Amino acid sequence: MDNKPTFEQAQLHLQIFEQRREARLRQARDWFFKNYYADSFEEAMRVAPMMTEAGTNWMMVVSYWEQACAFLNYGLLHEDLFFETSGEFFGVWERVKPSIEGGRKAFSSKTFLSNLEKAAERYETWIEKRSPGHVAAMREWTKNFREQAKKAA
């Protein structure tokens, strides 16, 4: 590792991790990874309509990771440490990516989830250097999990 995290970066990292353990956010994260599959903005609005429990779960998950990635993008967190210990954000980005442009248009927000997007782009490069094939395997796993969820429904 070229540089070590500072004490302050490590403290903030632990605070962000502690938020992740909060019961309501854990519930939202559980819902998100079991239920959120959308290939378009319209489908996303059917899966997680605004002003519903599902919509609240969705917003809790993406806003949590958007905030964490903003801290990362502004240099408040140590990138290697974050990437080594927080890969979940990439899974969240992979789930919302197909619907993000439609959402940005619908809400006239070109920057909606842009911190998550920027961090995910860097993470993909970072992890592929260290573990070639990881992203493809993760995408295949998600595809298979989605197919199993459809069959179970």
Segments (PLM) and residue ranges:
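Acidic, Ser/Pro/Thr-rich low-complexity regulatory regions
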Residues: 1-153
